[in-house]
Design a protein with these regions (language model features):
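Short, charged, surface-exposed hinge/linker loops at domain edges
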Residues: 1-6, 13, 38-68
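A short, exposed loop/beta-hairpin motif centered on an aromatic-Gly-Thr core
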Residues: 24-35
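Hydrophobic residues in alpha-helical membrane-spanning segments
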Residues: 22-25, 60
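Short aromatic-glycine-(Arg/Gly/Cys) micro-motifs in beta-strand/loop hairpins
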Residues: 8-23
């Protein structure tokens, strides 16, 4: 599944931050853009695995692609 990723630089954290708005609380960071996106893929997998274990629904991706 392909979820929307919001990626931005955080001056406070001095890192790139990735938010996955379709998966509540799903965030990752990294010292580079590429590392942040790779970390987000791991966190998305873990988020979905935890949701399955708890019997919670996993939202379908909205399918919107946008550049900001």
């Amino acid at each position: 599944m392909r979820y929307e990723l919001i990626i931005y630089w955080s001056r406070a954290d001095e890192a790139f931050v990735v938010e996955v708005p379709e998966l509540p609380g799903c965030m990752a960071d990294g010292s580079s853009y590429e590392e942040a996106v790779a970390n987000a893929q791991v966190v998305i997998h873990e988020w979905m695995e935890t949701a399955r274990e708890l019997g919670r629904p996993i939202p379908e991706p909205r399918g919107k692609l946008a550049y900001a």
